[in-house]
Amino acid sequence: MAKGLFDLSGKVAVITGGNSGLGLAFARGIARQGGSVAIWARNEEKNAAAKKELEAFGVKVTTHKVDVSSEEQTVAGYQEVMQAHGRVDSVFANAGLPPPQTRSMLDLSTKEFQDFLNVSLTGAYLTLREGARLMVKRSEAGDIGGSLVFCGSLSMFKGLAGKPSYAGSKGGMGAIVRSMAVEFGKYGIRANSVAPGYVKTGMTGTGELSPLDKFMLIKNAIPRPGYMEDYEGVAAYLASDASSFHTGDTLTIDGGCMVML
C-alpha cells in the first residue's frame, strides 16, 4: 500500500454519486492510497460493481442508498457511515443531476428551476454541512482536521446560456464552500471545489474521438479531452495531509481550457 505524503491509511472518505463517473474516479484515488470509502448512490447494481472494484485495492468499502436532497436521509446516511467506519475524514459532494436540456430561462418554470436546485445545490449543501458537523465534533475532541470537497464545473467561472439552474447550482455551492472554508478553518477543516473541464466517461485511449473530442483539441492547452483517471490524483491530494493548508479554493482540472483565448 502506498505510504508517504498522500497516504490515506486509517482515513474514511464519503463520496456521493461514487458508483460511476467522476465520483468513482475520486473513489479510486482514495482507495489507491489506502483510504476506506463510503459510497452514497441509489443504483444498487452500480454500487455493488463499484464496491467490488474498489475492494481490489485492499481497502474497506461500504455502499449506502441515500437521497441527498432529503435532510433526513442525509443525516441517516452519516449515521450508517459512523456505525460502519467510526469516523469521517473527507466528504466529496459529487452527486447531482446532469445538465438539463438547453432552454432560455424565460421558458424555464420556477418549479423546474427549484427541483434542480433541490438536488444539485441543497443536496450538496446538506452533504457537506452534515459531514462538517461530524468533523467539528471530532476536532473538538482533539482529532483535528477534515476535508470538504464540492464537484463543480467551469460554469462557476463562465457564462452558460440556456442552463441557469445548472450554472446556479454550481456557482452557488462555490460560494457556500468558500464560506465553509472561513467558518471551519479554526478546526483544521478545509473546504474546496473541483471544477472539471470536458471529460470523457470512458478510460484513456478507448474508442475514436467524437466531433466534440476533436473540438476540445483546440480548446484545451493540453490537446485532448479529460479522462476519469485524470481526477484520481486530485481526490487523493484533497483528502490527504498534503492539502492541510489548502482551503477556500477552486481547483480547475481542465487541461488548460480556462487559460486559452
Enumerate the language-model features and the residues they cover:
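Active-site helix of classical SDR
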Residues: 128, 169, 177
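Short C-terminal tail/terminal secondary-structure segment
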Residues: 2-4, 102, 158, 218-219, ...
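Conserved glycine-rich cofactor-binding loop
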Residues: 12, 19-20
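Residue(s) in the substrate-gating loop at a strand-loop-helix junction
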Residues: 153
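C-terminal helical subdomain
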Residues: 193, 214-246, 253-255
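Substrate-binding pocket helix/loop in short-chain dehydrogenase/reductase
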Residues: 102-105, 109-114, 216
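Short, small/polar-rich loop/turn modules that mediate ligand/substrate recognition or access, typified
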Residues: 185, 190, 246-248
